[in-house]
Amino acid sequence: MNEFQTESFVSLKPYDLVKVNRGAYVGSLEARASDPIPPAYIFEGPGTLITTAGQYSLVRWHLIPAPDVWLATAQLEAYSED
């Protein structure tokens, strides 16, 4: 299993709970290739980091029936229930 560091220097590994960092996502290539208004659940989390490949991670969302999605690992941050 691969382990990557995000821009916030938080090490993420498979099966960690994650959410998308809004500042890193908005205006990114992934955001431009998606819906103009991103769904709130990606910023609220939690999602499970399933696997990584290169600079991307596959995330599975928990709260709604949504397809798994590949996102840049640098756009992810650890989920906390704060």
UniProtKB/Swiss-Prot annotation:
EC number: 7.1.1.-
Cystine connections: none
Coiled-coil annotated spans: none
Bilayer topology: Peripheral membrane protein
Record's GO cellular component terms: organellar chromatophore thylakoid membrane; plasma membrane; plastid
Primary localisation category: plastid
Domain of life: Eukaryota
Gene Ontology molecular functions: oxidoreductase activity, acting on NAD(P)H, quinone or similar compound as acceptor; quinone binding
Assembly and binders: NDH-1 can be composed of about 15 different subunits; different subcomplexes with different compositions have been identified which probably have different functions.
Similarity-based family: Belongs to the complex I NdhO subunit family.
Function text: NDH-1 shuttles electrons from an unknown electron donor, via FMN and iron-sulfur (Fe-S) centers, to quinones in the respiratory and/or the photosynthetic chain. The immediate electron acceptor for the enzyme in this species is believed to be plastoquinone. Couples the redox reaction to proton translocation, and thus conserves the redox energy in a proton gradient. Cyanobacterial NDH-1 also plays a role in inorganic carbon-concentration.
Protein name: NAD(P)H-quinone oxidoreductase subunit O, organellar chromatophore
Species lineage: Eukaryota, Sar, Rhizaria, Cercozoa, Imbricatea
